[in-house]
């Protein structure tokens, strides 16, 4: 039987929040585009974007202390926090546009107001948090942040965290009422649900992309297999985006572009303790982030989180890190081995040598007992009882390993976009802050991969309609910032 051939304008690989965001933006900018979307699983957002596979934190740098490191001279670095906070405001604006236009329904199903808190104890950590608060206060985006080292005040903000806590402990916290909990799984599936109604958009579930090659005519040829039937297809398109979570690295290697040489991946798995006692769940209404242990990766910063999942309030603590050679929860144990190539073996070995503390930390996490996990939980919930909590597996994250200027390997704890020199291919690697900043990442990608189109009046006007702050800094334009926050709070039904 002849292999089916499909001609398209855009191919999106992976049905997660990134592909949904890019597909939606491109279709709004040019409704005539033909888009083919391929997903290995039988449902969208079942890997990294699923509600149980991530913390659901609307990352805005309100509470995540790893975004504001203390420098050697004692000052607080704020650049990353500012960038992430601006980016999350961009996400809120696009979601507001989609709700206002009726393209997304019931925003309360995917985003809820949940205060973001940072909590620390010990003299040095309290002093750090005070300095962090003062450093962020100079920026309008963080003006509504509150700081307190008063036990009674912190009890108001997070009673469960303070219950049975040693009153002699030196403790401090910050709180931002503007914080949110986001169900990226629901959001992603709703975005794809809308995309599927548009002419020219086709979604293919249970389809594995096993080949990717640049043709002489400048187009890409993707080889795709229907996992359910075994049927194979060839897809031809001038632009391909790979947003396949942990699976992106292997596809980048198949694409064989010069810009992708030297990249490697380090898989880190995660687990949560989920509370099963409704009385305990009701006592907590915040996302409380602490400080990471020495050697711990940034995504392992401990936090006790109120979640809203499928209309129900939930309470999670973690994440506990682990190690698996899989790049996806539904991946293969051979993923790590298959990812090793001549071009990346030196960076991967170099990154391993440089990250001995991380290796030690992961080993300790993997071998810890249920009592060890309870001990970690009790630092944030002193009154916790083992019988009220069950262990759940979270998502799989592949941290980026890339070459530094000397050709040695460095481990990057962030999101990395790799693009071909001609803009015909873009690949998203890495993890946090990921989903929260998806809109800004995709706008930047569009600017790089569609440079001529993005300069046109039509695209410029549409981008400003979807994202009113497009081309401006909300931190610098304080009036616009307040206006946009007021509108997004109203349309997204956020109670601040």
Curated annotation (Swiss-Prot):
What InterPro entries does the entry give?
Answer: FAD/NAD-bd_sf, MQO
Which molecular-function annotation in GO is an example for this chain? 2-hydroxyglutarate dehydrogenase activity
Q: Which residues form a coiled coil?
A: none
Do you know which Pfam families this protein is assigned to? Answer: Mqo
Superkingdom in the source lineage:
Bacteria
The processes (GO biological process) annotated in the record are: tricarboxylic acid cycle
UniProt keyword Transferase present: no
- HAMAP family per record: MQO (MF_00212)
For this chain, the family text in UniProt reads: Belongs to the MQO family.
- What is this protein identified as? Probable malate:quinone oxidoreductase
């Amino acid at each position: 039987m002849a292999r089916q051939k499909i001609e398209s304008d855009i191919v999106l690989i992976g049905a997660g929040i990134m592909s949904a965001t890019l597909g939606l933006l491109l279709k709004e900018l040019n409704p005539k585009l033909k888009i083919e979307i391929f997903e290995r699983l039988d449902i969208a957002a079942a890997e990294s974007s699923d509600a149980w596979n991530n913390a659901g934190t609307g990352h805005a740098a309100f509470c995540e202390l790893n975004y504001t490191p203390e420098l050697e001279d004692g000052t607080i670095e704020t650049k990353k926090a500012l960038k992430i906070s601006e980016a999350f405001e961009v996400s809120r604006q696009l979601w507001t546009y989609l709700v206002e236009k009726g393209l997304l329904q019931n925003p309360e199903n995917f985003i809820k107001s949940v205060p973001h808190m940072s909590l620390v104890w010990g003299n040095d950590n309290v002093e750090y948090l005070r300095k962090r608060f003062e450093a962020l206060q100079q920026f309008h985006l963080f003006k509504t942040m509150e700081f307190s080292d008063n036990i009674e005040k912190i009890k108001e903000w997070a009673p469960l965290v303070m219950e049975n806590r040693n009153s002699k402990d030196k403790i401090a916290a910050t709180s931002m009422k503007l914080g949110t909990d986001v169900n990226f799984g629901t959001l992603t599936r709703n975005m794809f649900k809308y995309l599927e109604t548009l002419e020219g958009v086709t979604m293919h579930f249970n389809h594995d992309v096993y080949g990717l090659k640049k043709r002489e005519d400048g187009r890409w040829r993707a080889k795709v297999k229907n996992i359910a039937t075994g049927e194979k297809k060839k897809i031809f398109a001038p632009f391909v985006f790979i947003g396949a979570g942990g699976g992106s690295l292997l596809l980048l290697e198949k694409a064989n572009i010069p810009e992708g040489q030297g990249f490697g991946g380090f898989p880190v798995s995660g687990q949560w303790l989920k509370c099963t006692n409704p009385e305990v769940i009701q006592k907590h209404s915040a996302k409380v982030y602490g400080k990471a242990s020495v050697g711990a990766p940034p995504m392992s910063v401990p936090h006790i989180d109120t979640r809203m999942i499928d209309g129900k309030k939930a309470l999670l603590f973690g994440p506990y890190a682990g190690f698996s050679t899989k790049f996806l929860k539904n991946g293969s144990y051979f993923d790590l081995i298959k990812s090793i190539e001549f071009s990346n073996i030196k960076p991967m070995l170099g990154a391993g040598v440089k990250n001995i503390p991380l290796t030690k930390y992961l080993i300790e996490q993997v071998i810890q007992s249920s009592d060890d996990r309870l001990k970690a939980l009790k630092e944030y919930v002193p009154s916790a009882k083992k019988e009220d909590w069950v262990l759940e597996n979270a998502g799989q994250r592949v941290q980026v390993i890339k070459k530094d200027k000397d050709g040695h390997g460095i481990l990057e704890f962030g999101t990395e976009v790799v693009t071909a020199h001609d803009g015909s291919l873009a690949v998203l690697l890495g993890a946090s802050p990921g989903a929260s900043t998806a809109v800004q990442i995709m706008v930047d990608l569009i600017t790089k991969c569609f440079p001529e189109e993005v300069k046109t009046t039509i695209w410029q006007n549409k981008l400003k309609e979807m994202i009113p702050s497009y081309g401006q800094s909300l931190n610098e334009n304080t009036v616009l910032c307040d206006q946009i926050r007021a509108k997004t709070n109203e349309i997204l039904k956020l109670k601040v």
